[in-house]
Amino acid sequence: MVPVVALVGRPNVGKSTLFNRLTRTRDALVADFPGLTRDRKYGRAEVEGREFICIDTGGIDGTEDGVETRMAEQSLLAIEEADVVLFMVDARAGLMPADEAIAKHLRSREKPTFLVANKTDGLDPDQAVVDFYSLGLGEIYPIAASHGRGVLSLLEHVLLPWMDDVAPQEEVDEDAEYWAQFEVEQNGEEAPEDDFDPQSLPIKLAIVGRPNVGKSTLTNRILGEERVVVYDMPGTTRDSIYIPMERDEREYVLIDTAGVRKRGKITDAVEKFSVIKTLQAIEDANVVLLVIDAREGISDQDLSLLGFILNSGRSLVIVVNKWDGLSQEVKEQVKETLDFRLGFIDFARVHFISALHGSDVGNLFESVREAYDSSTRRVSTAMLTRIMTMAVEDHQPPLVRGRRVKLKYAHAGGYNPPIVVIHGNQVKDLPDSYKRYLMNYFRKSLEVMGTPIRIQFKEGENPYANKRNTLTPTQMRKRKRLMKHIKKSK
């Protein structure tokens, strides 16, 4: 098993900064703002080729109230999940009562714990950490996470020896293929098409929507545990949380995201970062669950978010939440509104659920798998060309400047979303109505559901363009005789 390392401590001691440093990412939101991290965030890290899982947690200070109570519960759960704990304290702020309370809890759990004093840059490390020895956790390791000072020493002299004791190096991670593919995607590289098997990779499933529509409640319902903070307050989730899971022998990576509001209502800098993370999560996902509040109906912001999903080419499943408790008359009105405002999304499945009570949640995954399979299915050039030919036979392309547009052949240009490339003459002059006709024809013929189809057109090149006709010697002699004859006749 890959060791699990949890970062715990008071708010704003630098846990997310160290998390980003260890995982070599910027996945965790970082700001000089206590209480920014609210959910457990997992990341992959390594030291000298040895991998471990790092968990970033929300701060604990003993004065939690409201949503902060749920944050503290998440941090305590992370301690239970971890094999080793890095207990972080703030060297600049000094020893606090909350530090003593956390240390007491850690001692009661009897977990391997290492005390890390952060923010020692510009200070005498020995002098800055002396008060923390009273916590009774042994050696103290001074670092400056924001600049990386002391982090490598922490890994080499603390984590690596501990890992050598508890995890033999010969152990192979059974998820290595997934993480290798993840690294390839992150670096912008692409594996050869012959080696690609979409069924061998986890389906990345993003749950998005406006604030407080029930995204985290749905996430917890799917997982069957209180994995993310749920509170009846808009903006509870601030970061995108990636959660591996398995259902019906199929692997998924569930992505719970922050709510997206109208741009004019986003005033907090942290919320702006959260929105960016949500949009990045959409682009990173294979399938997106767009959650809509049945009691509030479809807003312009829902349509804006829907537009971003479609422009990103992601597969889509629409989820209407909070369906329980509505009268039959209201339900009919909601369905009519959906048909009217979302009529152009005829390829997406719509589910009416209650995330709180779990009604119809289990049926979501059938639509998710259908959408993913449609977006990654391989189709041969012969099949696509045959479909294109049938479409032309059923409805001829229009005349352009007196000439009929000619479509020659079609082939696949990409997947997730499926891209069909059509070659022909004057194809760029085709009207939008005929392009939509072709797109719908391909969708029906291929039985594509849950994912948009994109069609690209390429003009056939004229082989004689920009070439001069060079006469042969015989043609030159004939031309001279012809010119002489013309001159004599004049």
Curated annotation (Swiss-Prot):
PROSITE patterns: G_ENGA. Pfam families: KH_dom-like, MMR_HSR1. GO terms for molecular function: GTP binding; ribosome binding. InterPro entries: G_ENGA, GTP-bd, GTPase_Der, KH_dom-like, KH_dom-like_a/b, P-loop_NTPase, Small_GTP-bd. GO terms for biological process: ribosome biogenesis. Residues 377-461 form the KH-like domain. Residues 3-166, 203-376 form the EngA-type G domain. GTP 1 binds at residues 9-16, 56-60, 118-121. Keywords: GTP-binding, Nucleotide-binding, Repeat, Ribosome biogenesis. The keyword Nucleotide-binding applies. GTP 2 binds at residues 209-216, 256-260, 321-324. Transmembrane segments: none annotated. Associates with the 50S ribosomal subunit. GTPase that plays an essential role in the late steps of ribosome biogenesis. Belongs to the TRAFAC class TrmE-Era-EngA-EngB-Septin-like GTPase superfamily. EngA (Der) GTPase family. This is GTPase Der. It comes from Salmonella gallinarum (strain 287/91 / NCTC 13346).
